[in-house]
Amino acid sequence: MGIYCNFSRCVAAERLLKRITKETVMEALEAILTRRCVRSFDPARIPSEDLVEKIAEAGTFAPSGMGRQAGLIIKLYNREYRDRFAALNAQIMGREDDPFYGAPLLFIVFADKRQATYLYDGALVMGNMMLAAHALGLGSCWVHRAREIFASDEGKKFMQDNGIEDFYEGIGFLALGYLAGEPRQATPRKAGFIREVR
């Protein structure tokens, strides 16, 4: 059986394994089991750039088909863009309230549609960032309709103005911020969620 990593990668993997303890494993599982979508943010509390960068970095380490890293993460601080995307999103939904739930900051995840697994790759980027946000004490919510918005003339102009190539497709918006109020309880898991074949 061959070893499919060069020396530096093997050393890095060995060091990582030494840092993994029972406590860190339990913390990771706890983050997965206690994360909730947040639909009420405190708009006055803006996450620090350090926290935002850690969350974005977690997204870059999401699995991807053949390791091709199809995802692209945009950290959106611009309030004018944020509010315009909120208006477009609400229009598509046929609603008038803020689809970003008052979140002061957005991530936008795109993925390279030339890659066969781009939808899955983009979804995994979103998932990694949601877990990282929760682990760092922040709330997040995946908001859909990025595909529709960035297929529109206005969305295409945003992409062009900000150097985002046209082979990228919108996967999702990630509303990010501090919770306003208490986190909600998890909905009970559905019966038959897990099945077994032997």
What does each model-found stretch correspond to?
Residues 3-10, 20-198:
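Acidic, surface-exposed loops and disordered segments
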Residues 16-17:
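Leucine-biased recognition of intrinsically disordered, low-complexity hydrophobic segments
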